[in-house]
């Protein structure tokens, strides 16, 4: 009960990002030397939803509620993000995949579908590549994967300046200004910045202003060079992923390139475009995103 009260108190006041319904239970799960905040609801075959930067697992609420009618839905906050614990290290995506595998073990889930966005894609690839027998389908949404496909060319994009924005001085610059920093991404990477409303921005700014949160977010990016090494090794050792993959790019962001990237790492890829959206698919066009994901998982 004390844990439940503490978690509810941590929810930023006044946010319109919808809290998960009472049918979902939130708990801290010990895994791989840390603890992840995990929401679980529904019944049926399992599906794991992984978020990325400037979001938390809260982003998936509309999809999670829809899937819970016939799935057991598992929604963690990644290591060092949201309401999960903030360890000093372990931010390679290969290691964070072990976090998620440990969550599945704790919940006695052997196999699951997987839906990922942004940095969640990177953890998702490392999970599927290390445990291919445990991931039955994968929906990967609007972000590249270190070391896979045209990664080196993608790094040249001026929109990705933040991949190298880190260190003590950068953290001091951002401290107390988390809202300003996050607004840059909501505005620059969206098709229409007004679709990320004021309450949503306040909600995530409050979560990223929690102690150590921005430092750990920067650590996610700092791990990219090692992630690229790890992913190339995983692909070389295991070959292309065999499970069905739906690669969704936002119309005003990755677009069809998302599927092209995934075809370098998976052999059964279907491409799709989330229309009228930039990178923030669940904020900008949740109805289309939910419809495309649920249709694919139902096949």
Can you annotate each of these PLM segments?
Residues 16-27, 34-36, 46, 81-115, ...:
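Flexible "cap/lid" subdomain of the alpha/beta-hydrolase fold that forms the substrate-access gate
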Residues 277-286, 290:
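Catalytic histidine-centered segment of alpha/beta-hydrolase-like enzymes
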């Amino acid at each position: 009960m004390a844990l439940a009260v503490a978690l509810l108190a941590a929810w930023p006041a006044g946010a319109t990002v919808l809290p998960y319904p009472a049918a979902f239970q939130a708990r801290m799960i010990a895994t791989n030397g840390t603890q992840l905040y995990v929401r679980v609801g529904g019944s049926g075959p399992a599906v794991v939803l992984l978020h990325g930067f400037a979001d938390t697992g809260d982003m998936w609420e509309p999809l999670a509620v829809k899937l819970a009618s016939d799935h057991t839905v598992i929604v963690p906050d990644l290591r060092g993000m949201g309401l999960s614990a903030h360890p000093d290290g372990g931010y390679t995506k290969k290691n964070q995949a072990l976090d998620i595998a440990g969550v599945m073990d704790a919940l006695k889930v052997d196999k699951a579908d997987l839906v990922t966005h942004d940095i969640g894609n990177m953890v998702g690839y490392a999970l599927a590549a290390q445990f291919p027998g445990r991931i039955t389908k994968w929906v990967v949404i609007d972000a590249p994967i270190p070391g896979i496909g045209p990664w080196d060319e993608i790094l040249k994009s001026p929109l990705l300046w933040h991949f190298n924005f880190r260190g003590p001085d950068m953290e001091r610059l951002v401290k107390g200004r988390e809202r300003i920093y996050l607004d840059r991404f909501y505005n620059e990477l969206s098709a229409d910045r007004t679709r990320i409303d004021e309450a949503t921005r306040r909600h995530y700014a409050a979560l990223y202003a929690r102690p150590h949160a921005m430092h750990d977010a920067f650590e996610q990016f700092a791990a990219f060079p090692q992630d690229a090494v790890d992913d190339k090794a995983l692909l070389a050792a295991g070959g292309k992923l065999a499970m069905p993959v739906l690669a969704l790019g936002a119309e005003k962001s990755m677009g069809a390139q998302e599927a092209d990237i995934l075809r370098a790492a998976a052999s059964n890829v279907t491409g799709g475009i989330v229309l009228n959206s930039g990178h923030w698919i669940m904020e900008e066009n949740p109805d289309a995103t939910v419809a495309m994901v649920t249709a694919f998982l139902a096949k």
